[in-house]
Swiss-Prot record:
It is a peripheral membrane protein. The keyword Metal-binding does not apply. This is Putative membrane protein insertion efficiency factor. Its main location: membrane. The keyword Cell inner membrane applies. Signal peptide: none annotated. It holds the Pfam family YidD. It comes from Nitrobacter hamburgensis (strain DSM 10229 / NCIMB 13809 / X14). Could be involved in insertion of integral membrane proteins into the membrane. Keywords: Cell inner membrane, Cell membrane, Membrane.
Length: 114
């Protein structure tokens, strides 16, 4: 039986959804944090946007691997002796960042510093 155009479109949608599964899983964990633990702890992030919004945007833009490293770097900077202020997710992938050098995704010091 010859595959029809309709079935090949359906297969493409399934493949696209499978590739987005890790990204959506990471975003789901952030959503759960926002709606369960965050209201109990209180809204007291030192940065704008908040760390959970930053993490959600970073994972949406760069995937679970790259966005997860960006979020880890942000969480490590969000402490009493860390940075504060406006710190947006970069619009493009940081220079030198690749899947085998994930620490290059994170901004480990400063706010909006390269």
């Amino acid at each position: 039986m010859k595959p029809t155009r309709q079935s090949s479109i359906h297969c493409a949608d399934c493949a696209r959804a499978a590739l987005r599964l890790p990204r959506n899983s990471g975003r789901a964990l952030i959503w759960i944090y926002r709606h369960t633990l965050s209201p109990l702890v209180g809204f007291n992030c030192r940065h704008l946007p908040t760390c959970s919004v930053y993490g959600d945007e970073a994972i949406e833009r760069f995937g679970l691997w790259g966005g997860g490293w960006m979020t880890l770097a942000r969480l490590l900077r969000c402490q009493p002796w860390g940075t504060s202020g406006i710190d947006n997710v970069p619009a493009t992938k940081p220079p030198g960042a690749s899947w085998y050098r994930p620490w290059r995704y994170g901004r480990w010091r400063g706010v909006n510093a390269p």
